[in-house]
Amino acid sequence: MKNLIALTLLLGGSTLLCAQKPAKTPATYKPVKSEMYRKGWIDFNKNGVKDVYEDPSAPLEARIENLLQQMTLDEKTCQMVTLYGYKRVLKDDLPTPEWKELLWKDGIGAIDEHLNGFQQWGLPPSDNAYVWPASRHAWALNEVQRFFVEDTRLGIPVDFTNEGIRGVESYRATNFPTQLGLGHTWNRELIRQVGLITGREARMLGYTNVYAPILDVGRDQRWGRYEEVYGESPYLVAELGIEMVRGLQHNHQVAATGKHFAAYSNNKGAREGMARVDPQMSPREVENIHIYPFKRVIREAGMLGVMSSYNDYDGIPVQGSYYWLTTRLRGEMGFRGYVVSDSDAVEYLYTKHGTAKDMKEAVRQSVEAGLNVRCTFRSPDSFVLPLRELVKEGGLSEEVINDRVRDILRVKFLIGLFDAPYQTDLAGADREVEKEENEAIALQASHESVVLLKNADELLPLDINSTKKIAVCGPNANEEGYALTHYGPLAVEVTTVLEGIQEKTKGKAEVLYTKGCDLVDAHWPESEIIDYPLTDDEQAEIDKAVENARQADVAIVVLGGGQRTCGENKSRTSLDLPGRQLQLLQAIQATGKPVVLILINGRPLSINWADKFVPAILEAWYPGSKGGTALADILFGDYNPGGKLTVTFPKTVGQIPFNFPCKPSSQIDGGKNPGPTGNMSRINGALYPFGYGLSYTTFEYSDLDIPPRVITPNESATVRLKVTNTGKRAGDEVVQLYIRDVLSSITTYEKNLAGFQRIHLEPGEAQELSFTIDRKHLELLDADMKWVVEPGDFVLMAGASSEDIRLNGTLTVEDYQTRAKAIEAQKPAKRVSASTNPEDAENVLDEKINTAWQGNKGDYITFALKNGAKVDKVAIAFTRDNNLPATFEIQLSGGGGQFLTVYSGTVSEYGKLISYPFKGTTASDLRIVLNDDRVSIAEVKF
């Protein structure tokens, strides 16, 4: 609530200080120089002729080359730099006559965070008049765009970039949970909706490029930016990253720029020395964990932007590495967009890494490596002028410059900047940004991100009718700052946990509130290693909370972290609750009243005492502006929590690195017997494992089936199972599928995530699920660092977490030579036709159930199909005298006697003609193979 008041005062002050044009924002935007704007095209170079690059119907690459040929070196190099927006580097909110004399008179590649109101890092409060409403903001960005279109020689539009990992970073926009919270929803469709809304609101505000998603994989829970990752599984990060990019880039509304490439999130000891140096990983670990998400998101979602990181890997700074930015990113992954540096990454080549002697050498290294656009908090001259000097001196070829500029122009063409450079629907911006439908998705995300960690004796949900007095305390109970951090909306209305509870219980219960303690104490972080006594003021505040708890029916304690303890450059040396939070919790627990602990934080915390003594615990991460409403719904049973952990909770910081996936037995050691005479020397096991999360209801897993059970490396198998809600409440279950390679040429992971689905079931409802297992789940990097699928057995495990496996089965992969030999060794098929096998033909094609062909395990019957027939299902009536379950396979052949399995399963029902579908294939012969004895086929229909 407080931020709305601040925003009103801010805008009121701006009205007095700044000249505002127009006085009233129009409903639509129409540029002034109408002679440039022709019917169906724009005369960007003002020559009166429709050049190829100005023709929307011309091929993309032809438009790029036509424009590139017309550009001077000065114009090309200006495209290779970002200009930070108002109050960052740019001192003007709107274009001034001086702009025609500055560097960007020749254009600019991108302007970042312009007029978005960002105020961090000691900058003065935003005093621009264009921060809100959305229509006025869009109008202002249009005016800036108009300078580049109308007042530069070639009229190349600027790419307006902005942050957006939890909603677009504008003063007002739809505010979602932090990306770590979004990961805990495990909901692909929801993540796509988040991307769609973020991209749509960004474009309506005037932005064309969103720096999202974060594709870093969390591996060290101490790391400050842990709040920004989806989780610690590369498969999950890739799956959600794909959906986020598809949403953002829907209809090319904006470009999505994933970050940070590469090997960024595992710096030594989680320390952040600005350059994020010395990540501790083997080459194979980098590929399996950190490169995997980027590779899949680029290939499967067509991501148009990548931000290069400023760490080194094995002594080579990524931002200066041709191997990473060109050989791998473009050559192997097929990336076709542009690479922008993280802020100051180019400078770090000589100021931090020491691999360049000066700025000019740093520029050369980065551009030769593959960098397209440099981003920094300094004037663009500091990059562009050395770049021009290098070309003129022969230190860089202009062809390298051309290659880099081609990528930049390609993105600008793809997102429509040369066809529609302005956001013309200004009134639409006011309708779209923060509209009711978007806010509903934000609330859904807040609901689905919450994880129930403990619920002893079913304390939750609370009965709103019998709970008459509620004590609420904790530093995060009435805090809203967690929803207003960098990289997302800055001044939205936030419902705190206290406000959510008060609104939910209005007229039904009395809510007693006191803070209890601050987020950290005066000595923090030193107090993590030295036990300072409580001050009188600290003790008095805890005493107030205790007195409230004694009067109440239940105490709700809201603890965790915030901007002081987590975020960029805020890594920790401990995972314990900071400050006096544990002492507050222990004092409340000592009252004997039921206690519910809510955690609002950006990283897993080692809450061992709470796990042992507090009956109910909810993990909410940073739940967005709707977090208080969502948590109140969960506390009182209006929503059943269904989030699952995408990260591991260690019991102690001494276990780190401790994460998923891991190598066999790598996270367990030190003996098994505790005590003075035992051999246990350290704490083992996770406090809460990857995939863990409880519910107010229960779920049963059954009927696992894997057809076919034998495949070749390039074939796929389907895993089927059934999940039933066996409880009394409707709820969500995140069904997880894991895979383990039983025998391999290198050490592989103990288990790896291979699939997941979030489903909603009413009480008693059952749902059949299917997962596809294909090459991406089976391959490994062999001893020669080549991706291969090795023949052998793979165990497939379905369950409610990585440690709560309910069902398992085995899939076998055989190589092509083994398959060919097996086919050749098979006995001749019993071909059914009227001429060669009249008895079989009569028995299975006479449309009579009471006549049948019978076989035993390994027997098969083959049917000749019409030449070139396409078959996608077969109806079969099986019978068996003992009615025991039986399995079978359907195989097809295109000729030459080689058959491939297209269906493997269990007989659904005896004595009835049942249809068994499979992927449609053209074939000449069809075979049914029995896997059990004394099974009869009474009838077959194609």
What is each PLM-predicted segment?
Residues L16-E779, E790-A798, S802:
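Glycoside hydrolase catalytic-domain context in secreted enzymes
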Residues M1-A23:
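Bacterial Sec-dependent N-terminal signal peptides
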Residues G48, Y816-N867, A877-L884, G905-E909, ...:
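Disordered, acidic Ser/Thr/Pro-rich linker "stalks" and the adjacent N-terminal cap
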Residues Q757, E765-F771, D859-F863, K912-Y916:
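Short strand-edge motifs at loop-to-beta-strand transitions and within beta-strands
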